[in-house]
């Protein structure tokens, strides 16, 4: 190689080295830019993660008795929930089939409120709604309305509509029914990008584990931890506690008379699938028992793998509602009531008219009107309500009826102390006033009511009249006092009016001159607790408390306090509330109570009791049975 050629080679090599150096420099600078300047952006692109927020249901507050013993509590359970957002482009019906097969393999059930059974051999369907069930027929009508069908539509018509709407023609009849039912349930729960669909509730831990193991192949199928209501003793005041249940479509979407639609529960922060108090104290104290839901954020990669979870908002449990009821005492009263009814039935087994089919007992504290026990017989078990509702609702003994608060009964002679208070307080009679009893009341020519004269006859004063329940005395005193006057006193003492309890109660009624069947003789009938007068057991208990308190009537109540569920701190305490007062003029209540103490001395089981007892029995002429008001004083003999 000559010198000129060597120079050319050197120049070319130098050019190549320079070009390579430039390329290397550009590459290095690009790497620096990617790793240092824009690393976060490219890292996100590489991982391609997405955050999803899920509601974490707060635990519902407990309901406890006066001693703090738990009556109703929340226990953790697991639901299978479908998220439309997470499902993406998955074949929904194919996914539903997989879930159903998985649930069936583990003995689970799924939500399906479609009132249609499986097809018969000919491929026809039938409604499962009971013809004699008002609730079933109402649900059936609502189902047809929601599908845009006429009320005369058959079960086949309903299924044809569902198959057409959700394109289920290619599926066998069995799967058409299964998938059609699930789609209908989705419609009821308003399944959308906003509302998840609760497909199955309270599933087993085995089912939970299986679904989590298959999460990569079942996108959008989530296990959500929630809380369900449970009862340590399901038979303790179930009528008063009430129940929780799912939000119904009617409560979720409200349309007023002007056609305006609102969503009041959504505005209060509820989701459509939430549980809510539907009756009793569970409904009345919903705002206290309901907690504040939390939010859990789940981060998923582009291939569906969960790469992170965080509790964005921690859920707060609801408050504890403490009752005035003592659960041990309540159970003792329940047993005593059942035992006495069984004793009556065994004693009078030859006389159907003397048998006792049902009963109620209410015990209140005279200090402040707090309810210590409220028993119904027959009753039911909260833990069995869902599975045995059909038996409970068809039972002729009406175990679902809250007799203690809503049963209306003729008070009979238990009404007589109210008439005595009215007559004494109004000056119609005094301690020395008497009425002659010869067994027949002869004031009316065409109406001659009688008296048994049990234990008495001749001139009877108010103490003796109450002790021996003399009808003649109260016929005459009632006529002279008039129903206008003694009714006013009875109302003040708690009869024929609301007692103030937190849950639904019947008002009852007293006999008045405004009654369509009123005649003058009704005044004497009503004076012994007959006529048109009907009251509730809780009113009788409130009335007895008013007599014990010398005319002061407190609001009858079941709730003692609202407590912080974490600390036990008292947030709100029920204070004694005076609802009405009968002014005690002189010795009115002393005389009435003296007569009622005399009643106790005529009853062998009470005569030797270690406490002073004042009471009054009543045996109305109607067939409701026996009533009794009973006052125990804390003074030993």
Identify what each model region corresponds to.
Residues 320-330:
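Bateman/CBS regulatory modules and CBS-like beta-alpha motifs in cytosolic regions of diverse proteins
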Residues 72, 78, 299-316, 325, ...:
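Beta-lactam-recognizing serine transpeptidase/beta-lactamase-like catalytic domain environment
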Residues 202-203, 327-328, 481:
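Short beta->alpha linker loops
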Residues 336-348, 427, 600:
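Structural motif corresponding to the C-terminal cap of alpha-helices
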Residues 1-314, 350-360:
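Membrane-proximal periplasmic segments of bacterial cell-envelope enzymes
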């Amino acid at each position: 190689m000559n010198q000129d050629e060597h120079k050319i080679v050197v120049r070319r090599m130098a050019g190549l080295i320079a070009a390579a150096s430039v390329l290397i420099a550009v590459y290095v600078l690009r790497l620096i830019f990617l790793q240092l300047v824009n690393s976060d952006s490219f890292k996100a692109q590489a991982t391609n993660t997405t955050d999803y927020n899920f509601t974490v249901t707060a635990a519902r507050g407990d309901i406890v008795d006066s001693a703090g013993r738990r009556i109703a509590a929340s226990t953790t359970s697991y639901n299978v929930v479908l998220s439309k957002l997470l499902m993406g482009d998955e074949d929904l019906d194919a996914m539903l089939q997989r879930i159903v097969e998985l649930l069936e393999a583990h003995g689970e059930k799924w939500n399906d409120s479609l009132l249609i059974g499986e097809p018969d051999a000919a491929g026809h369907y039938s409604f499962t709604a009971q013809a004699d069930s008002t609730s079933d027929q109402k649900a059936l009508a609502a189902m047809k309305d929601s599908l845009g069908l006429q009320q005369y539509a058959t079960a086949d018509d309903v299924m044809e509509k569902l198959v057409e709407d959700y394109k289920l023609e290619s599926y066998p009849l069995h799967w058409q029914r299964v998938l059609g039912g699930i789609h209908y349930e989705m419609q009821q729960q308003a399944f959308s990008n906003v509302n998840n669909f609760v497909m199955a509730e309270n599933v087993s831990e085995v089912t939970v584990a299986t679904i989590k193991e298959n999460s990569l192949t079942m996108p959008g199928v989530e296990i959500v931890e929630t809380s369900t209501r449970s009862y340590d003793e399901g038979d303790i005041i179930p009528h008063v506690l009430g129940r929780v249940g799912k939000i119904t479509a009617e409560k979720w979407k409200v349309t007023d008379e002007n056609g305006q639609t609102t969503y009041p529960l959504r505005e209060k922060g509820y989701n459509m699938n939430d549980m809510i108090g539907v009756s009793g104290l569970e409904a009345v104290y919903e705002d206290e028992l309901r907690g504040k839901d939390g939010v859990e954020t789940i981060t998923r990669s582009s291939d569906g793998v969960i790469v992170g979870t965080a509790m964005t908002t921690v859920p707060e449990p609801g408050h504890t509602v403490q009752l005035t009821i003592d659960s041990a005492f309540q159970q003792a009263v329940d047993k005593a009531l059942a035992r006495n009814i069984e004793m009556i039935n065994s004693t009078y087994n030859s006389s159907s008219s003397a048998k006792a089919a049902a009963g109620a007992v209410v015990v209140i504290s005279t200090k402040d009107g707090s309810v210590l026990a409220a028993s119904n017989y027959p009753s039911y078990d909260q833990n069995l309500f869902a599975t045995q509702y059909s038996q409970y609702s068809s039972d002729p003994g009406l175990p679902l009826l809250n007799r203690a608060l809503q049963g209306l009964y003729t008070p009979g002679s238990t009404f007589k102390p109210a008439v005595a208070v009215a007559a004494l307080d109004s000056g119609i009679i005094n301690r020395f006033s008497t009425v002659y009893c010869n067994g027949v009341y002869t004031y009316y020519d065409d109406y001659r009511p009688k008296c048994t004269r049990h234990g008495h006859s001749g001139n009877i004063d108010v103490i003796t009249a109450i002790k021996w329940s003399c009808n003649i005395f109260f016929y005459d005193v009632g006529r002279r006092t008039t129903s206008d006057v003694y009714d006013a006193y009875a109302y003040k003492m708690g009869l024929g009016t609301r007692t103030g309890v937190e849950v639904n109660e019947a008002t009852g009624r007293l006999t008045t001159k405004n009654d369509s069947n009123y005649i003058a003789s009704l005044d004497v009938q009503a004076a012994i607790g007959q006529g048109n007068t009907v009251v509730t057991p809780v009113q009788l208990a409130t009335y007895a408390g008013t007599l014990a308190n010398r005319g002061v009537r407190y609001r009858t109540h079941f709730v003692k306090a609202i407590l912080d569920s974490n600390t036990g701190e008292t947030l709100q305490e029920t204070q004694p509330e005076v609802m009405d007062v009968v002014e005690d003029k002189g010795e009115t209540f002393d005389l009435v109570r003296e007569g009622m103490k005399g009643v106790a001395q005529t009853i062998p089981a009470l005569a030797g009791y270690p406490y002073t007892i004042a009471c009054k029995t009543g045996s109305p002429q109607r067939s409701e049975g026996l009533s009794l008001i009973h006052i125990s004083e804390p003074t030993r003999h």
